[in-house]
Structure formats: structure tokens, C-alpha cells
Amino acid sequence: MKKIQKFVMAFLLGAMTLGFSACSDDNGVEEKFELPEIGQATTKINSSDKDMEKVTKNYVQNVVYPTYQALAANARTLYSASQTLYKAAEAGTMTQSHIDAACEAFKNTRREWERSEAFLFGSASDNELDPHIDSWPLDRKELKNALTSQTLIAGFKGDDPAKFVSENNTKFQSVLGFHGMEFVLFRNGKNRTAEALKANDTEEGMTSVKGIDELAFLQAVAADVKNITALLEFTWMGSAASNETKSVLSNASYVFTSLRYNGLAANGTMCYGQHLLSPSATTGYHSWQGTMNQIFIGGCDNICAEVADQKLGQAYRVATGNAGVTEDGERESIDYIESPYSHRSFIDYQDNIYSIKNSLYGTRDVNATTPAENSMMSLLKKMNYSGLNDLSNALNNAIQTLETAKNSGKSFVEEPGAQRVKDCIDAVSNLSEELNKAATWINLQDAI
């Protein structure tokens, strides 16, 4: 199931034949793949810049870029740890330390992804990279089919599992990404054991699945996540992306083949960083106020409302006898819980709110008590926004309420109807209200 998203604007996209090839030439020699040349964003702050422009430059340079770079770097580590784990299992030398290393790498990668969810607009949404690596709840039936298909298992164990996943994922699309990997690595809030992964799975309905095949799936999906997170970094940063990310994509040209405009913004003419910094009728951001509104509503409130209403709200409503109906006309489900196997739901949701804090404070320091000079919060203060304290208090309260739930000793999946869950819903909903108030106010101000 793809997560429900709302966006302030629709980017201008259309069908286009990609202007590069990684196919062999007439002599059977593979051509060198060249990444699209689209330059990089101009993020240097000048004294002549409008204040809203300074805020956006700081946001792009010091929040969005380093988050995607950390995500891509951690995904490379996750792939390496997953590959090492699979090869050790295949050789009969797997130890618990191999599993623990992969679990730790997973958690580090997951953290950066969750802390990017306040800016899912842009490449993650336009290129459908968000649902590609983060759809939930996990479809256990589809996962079982994938893990018992000899054809798919052979592909996961093949010479290029990342390419195999990229070209064949329609057969197991709903179990790609973080939640398929989570199922392999964690159960009941704990790392899987070496003994468990040396045998068949014991989960209900999965007893025909071999541990070695789960690990083959893990390293194949981790390879795909490595590519997708590199794509996120590159499409936002352009030529400013790290050499490691450029290397990953240069060796995986196939990830571009299903993307319109090479996955880039403004009909393939610029990276998403520059796109956000170019308010005009052409890019779709008609003014700096519109850019501010996109960050507040299309970014921060989009994830804030989802945490309250869906990530926390759906299972809570079912658990307390108030189940509703989804937009698809289906009954809400008690299983609509993110990260149930690792018991890290509250951690995920707090990281989502940290993503909002980082966006507003203009820094990736989640413990920051003072916003950066050119930040949303500093701009609101400079412009004498009367609701600034209410917004700040709502943000801090949402973080603290989730911290209390996280440290309660009970995970969300264990007690989805607990009062602590309602407390979190109320706190995050209040933050959503304050974000909307601030966005409405700033949209009416002059772009000083």
C-alpha cells in the first residue's frame, strides 16, 4: 500500500525519451555511461538576497543536501553489511556479529530516511522513490511468493542482484525497500539470531522459506536501496553530489530508464535544489512566498499530518473500536503500523518530527535549542509572527511526547490503543495546526 501524500503543487512532467544509453555498440563493446550534466544549485548566500531566498538557500544547503548525502552513504554501508552477511551464510561462516552489523547499518540508514520525510516533495515523490523503498504494511503473501520462487531467488543470488531487482520488481514491488529488509533482520523488537537464519523461517505462513534465501533477498534489496538513495542525492544536488554517489549511478545506468527527464526537475534542465531556488511560472514556484509554503505545507505538514492521522491514527482507531474507511474504500486495519518487526515505530515517528525541526531550524542538529541565522524560525521572528511561540512549543511537545512513548517499555505494535498513542496523536495534530497557521500567515507577507 502506498502512503497517502498531499502536495502544494504538481511538478511539470511528461513523457520523454531519455537522451543517453548504456547499451552495447555495433562491435559489442559496452559504451561508457555518462551521468546527465545539469550543474548544481547556487546556494551561496549574498547580502543582496531577499530574506526568504536566504532561508531557502540555507535549507537546501544545510538540511536537504546533507540529509540525502548521509542517507546515501549509510545505504552503501547497509549494502556492504548485507552482502557480507549473505556471503558468510553461504560459506557457512555466519556469526551473530554479521547479523548485528547489518541491523545497525539498517537502523542508521532508516534514521536518515525518516529524517528526510519533511521534504518528500521533489524527486522522492515525482519519481515515486518514496513508495519504491518505503511502502507498508508489508504484504506477507507477496513476500512469501518472492522468497519461494526459484526464478526470483536465482536472480537475488545472481551476479548483479541490484539490476535484477530494478528490472523485475513488479513481481514483488510491495516488499521492496526498508520493510522487506526489516522482516529479514528483526523479529519481536530484536535482531534475528544466527540459529534462526540458518534454518527455515518460523513466522506463521512462512515456514517454507529458507533463511539463506531471506539473506539473498536482503542483499539484493539493499543493493537496490543503495541505488535509489544515490538517485535521491544526485537528482537534488546535481554535479555537487558526492563522487561515491556518482560512481554508484555510473555503474547502474538502468535506474534512469524508467524515469521521465532522467529523474530531474523542470523537464530535465536542473536539479531539484536549483528548482526550489528558482521561483517562477516555469518551475511552478511563482514566488518566494510560494516556496515558503511548499516547505511548510508540501513538506513539513505533509509528514506531520500523516504521522498523526495514518501512522499513529489508523491502528489506534481500530484498536479503540473507531475504525473508519480508507480512501480506497477499505476498512482501516490494525496492521497499518510502520516498523512492527523491529518495534521502532515511535523512533520512526520521532525522526519524522525531527525532520520538521531540522527544516524549521535550518540545521541537522536535532538537539539544537537556537535556530540557525537564516532559518524558517529566525525569519518568522524577524517578521514578528505572533504565533512563533505556539509553533515552537508545539514542535517541542510533539518531540517530547514521542520520547515518552518511545521510553515507555511498550512498542506501538504491542499496545496500539494505549493512552500514550492518543497523547502522541494529539501533540502531533497540534503541531500540524501550528504549521498551517504559520504557512497561511507567511504566504500573505512581502518577500523581504
Kindly give the residue locations of the regions a language model identified.
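Bacterial signal peptide processing site
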Residues: 24-27
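A eukaryotic "domain-start" boundary segment
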Residues: 29-31
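Bacterial N-terminal signal peptides that target proteins for export
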Residues: 1-9
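C-terminal motif of bacterial Sec signal peptides marking the signal peptidase cleavage site
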Residues: 18-22
